[in-house]
Swiss-Prot record:
It comes from Salmonella typhimurium (strain LT2 / SGSC1412 / ATCC 700720). This is Probable endonuclease 4. Its cofactor is Zn(2+). Endonuclease IV plays a role in DNA repair. It cleaves phosphodiester bonds at apurinic or apyrimidinic (AP) sites, generating a 3'-hydroxyl group and a 5'-terminal sugar phosphate. One of its GO terms (molecular function) is phosphoric diester hydrolase activity. The lineage of its organism: Bacteria, Pseudomonadati, Pseudomonadota, Gammaproteobacteria, Enterobacterales.
Length: 285
């Protein structure tokens, strides 16, 4: 079964996120558990936690259908020790918030070397940062998102994701989230079913589908291989509809959150309905 949704706002309280997801016909959703552009956040109160759990139950969202995202400020591969520690503390807080909310996944961008340390050293720092957080939490999987490779961001090659996973001690609590726009911008073609087959065969060989814990379904304004991260609405960008139809009709993408981060929230309900219809079309074929 496909879990399909979008990254919804938690404005006004975390308990509003499940309701907003339900309003657009979603069977999955992503959210920030705190302001993503600030380092610090007030601790979660028992009331906030209870309200969120009650809302998830009311709208029939299990933890497997929810893919929270951490703060954009965090850089788990930071070359400077003080800044690295600040990021590690913030990441641990994000993991602990998920733990408190009964969530089992935390999606994050791996990190950047900022042109100051070798790529291999940065990847090792990211893996160690994950190890530190996993050692102090239970039940939450660290889900590494592939990047477009913009600037000095790592995680744009499947080999880089595999290297991070290789350095994580508890393999049962690490996974990846593949963003289609990022993959396309990083040079992984998705424009035809044949291209999708090739790209995901490579993913399966290098990373492994056992580590796929979520996806971000985004078309791309950016050009193929441009290393530029610019999302677009489904079918309106340089990837086109075929990739998303192909994903909907492939069982390897069942049972994980498939999250829209497309640029027009006003049509998320339409995009979700279209994605759902692609499954039905396959079932009837």
């Amino acid at each position: 079964m496909k879990y399909i949704g979008a990254h919804v706002s938690a404005a006004g309280g975390l308990a509003n996120a499940p309701a907003r997801a339900a309003e657009i016909g979603a069977t999955a959703f992503a959210l920030f558990t705190k302001n993503q552009r600030q380092w610090r956040a007030a601790p979660l109160t028992p009331q906030v936690i209870d309200d969120f759990k009650i809302a998830c139950e009311k709208y029939h969202f299990s933890a497997a259908q929810i893919l929270p995202h951490d703060s954009y400020l965090i850089n788990l591969g930071h070359p400077v020790s003080e800044a690295l520690e600040k990021s590690r503390d913030a990441f641990l807080d994000e993991m602990q918030r998920c733990e408190q909310l009964g969530l089992t996944l935390l999606n994050f961008h791996p990190g950047s070397h900022l042109m100051q340390i070798a790529q291999e050293d940065c990847l090792a720092r990211i893996a160690e940062s994950i190890n530190i957080a996993l050692a102090q939490t239970e039940g939450v999987t660290a889900v590494i998102e592939n990047t477009a490779g913009q600037g000095s961001n790592l995680g744009f090659e499947f080999e880089q994701l595999a290297a991070i996973i290789d350095g994580v001690e508890d393999k049962s609590r690490v996974g990846v989230c593949i963003d289609t726009c990022h993959a396309f911008a990083a040079g992984y073609d998705l424009r035809t079913p044949e291209a999708c087959e090739k790209t995901f065969a490579e993913f399966g060989k290098i990373v492994g589908f056992q580590y796929l814990r979520g996806m971000h379904l985004n078309d791309a304004k950016s050009a193929f291989g441009s290393r530029v991260d610019r999302h677009h609405s489904l079918g309106e960008g340089n990837i086109g509809h075929d990739a998303f139809r192909w994903i909907m009709q492939d069982g390897r993408f069942d049972g994980i959150p498939l999250i829209l981060e497309t640029i027009n929230p006003d049509i998320w309900a339409e995009e979700i309905a279209w994605l759902k219809a692609q499954q039905i079309a396959e079932a009837m074929a």
